Amino acid sequence: MAAKKDLLTQLRGKSDDDLDAYVHENKKALFALRAENLLQNKVVKVHMFSTHKKNIARALTVKQERKGKVHG
C-alpha cells in the first residue's frame, strides 16, 4: 500500500509532459508483453499486465485531477 502512495506522490510531482512520457512508456511495455504472449513465450510475467494498466490509469487520473475533473 505504501508503494502505491509513493508512486502517486511521484506522479503528482511530475509535469504533464513527464506524465505523457510515463504513460507512453507503460503502453509500450504493455504492447511488448502482449506481443510476447502472442508468441507463446513461457517467461511472460502475467501479473505485469495489470501492473502496467494500473500505472497508466494512475497517471491519467493525476492528469485529470489537475484539470479539475476528478470523476470522468
Curated annotation (Swiss-Prot):
One of its GO terms (molecular function) is structural constituent of ribosome. GO terms for cellular component: cytosolic large ribosomal subunit. InterPro entries: Ribosomal_protein_uL29, Ribosomal_uL29, Ribosomal_uL29_sf. Pfam families: Ribosomal_L29. Keywords: Ribonucleoprotein, Ribosomal protein. The keyword rRNA processing does not apply. One of its GO terms (biological process) is translation. Belongs to the universal ribosomal protein uL29 family. This is Large ribosomal subunit protein uL29. It comes from Chlamydia pneumoniae (Chlamydophila pneumoniae).
